[in-house]
Amino acid sequence: MDSPSGSLSPVAIDLAGVSKSYGGKIVVNDLSFTIAAGECFGLLGPNGAGKSTITRMILGMTSPSVGKITVLGAQEPGQVRLARAKIGIVSQFDNLDLEFTVRENLLVYGRYFRMSTREIETVIPSLLEFARLESKANTRVADLSGGMKRRLTLARALINDPQLLILDEPTTGLDPHARHLIWERLRSLLARGKTILLTTHIMEEAERLCDRLCVLEAGRKIAEGRPHALIEEQIGCPVIEIYGGDPQELSLLIRPNARRLEISGETLFCYTPDPEQVRAQLRAYSNLRLLERPPNLEDVFLRLTGREMEK
């Protein structure tokens, strides 16, 4: 695919003091963040955290109750048409025409942007190559695998060469192979200068793709930063997951060697700079299963909210 045409504003999206209420209930609460052109910025949080409402406001589909939103230099929602022409959208659900072929889906979608058939036909080969669907151009969408449909949805969003891509849970429901292929395609777009706003509840996805992210809970921002910086700041040591015993009893035993302990269900999470010492303390408990691993964004979310991310 061609590189993005035209110069980009150094700021792709800016939210300043944005709140949104429905029927007296606050669903987004005093939210501010800035997304630089060319970066991948993640909105990370469980269902109900406000991610969908935030993207709807960015797209001008609903107005903030309080605050200001600027997208690609256009203030939403008043100048929404100026911005929408430069935005590609990949929703959580494919919304493809199942009875049309892959090529026909691209042709129909291009016309929404008032592209001529000739213009669309010119870009279709590069879009098929990008999506690795060259051999499926004349295949009905109904006959594609789930991963192929997601790649087609992504390719379709690129038909007007947008400056900004908004991706809503782009790999939910995909198997690991299909998920990794989508991630590889998204990294190639970032290498070409596209800006991506990614909403996800998949921690690994956010950690692999995002330059920066905003962690949300109940419409509030509870953390913002680079994934690995957040992990180091909030956790900063190895993690041992302990299964099979009484978490309360085990906590008392290993607390002297733990930087922090968290209990989630029947699992005890031990954050410790000295994993070997903790293992030694637990050797007498033959029924335990221990998993030692590096810290990740799931730990950050648990640390900040006291609960695991809802799947």
UniProtKB/Swiss-Prot annotation:
It is an enzyme of class 7 (translocase). ATP binds at residues 45-52. CDD domains: ABC_subfamily_A. Signal peptide: none annotated. Pfam families: ABC_tran. The complex is composed of two ATP-binding proteins (NodI) and two transmembrane proteins (NodJ). Belongs to the ABC transporter superfamily. Lipooligosaccharide exporter (TC 3.A.1.102) family. This is Nod factor export ATP-binding protein I. It comes from Rhizobium johnstonii (strain DSM 114642 / LMG 32736 / 3841).
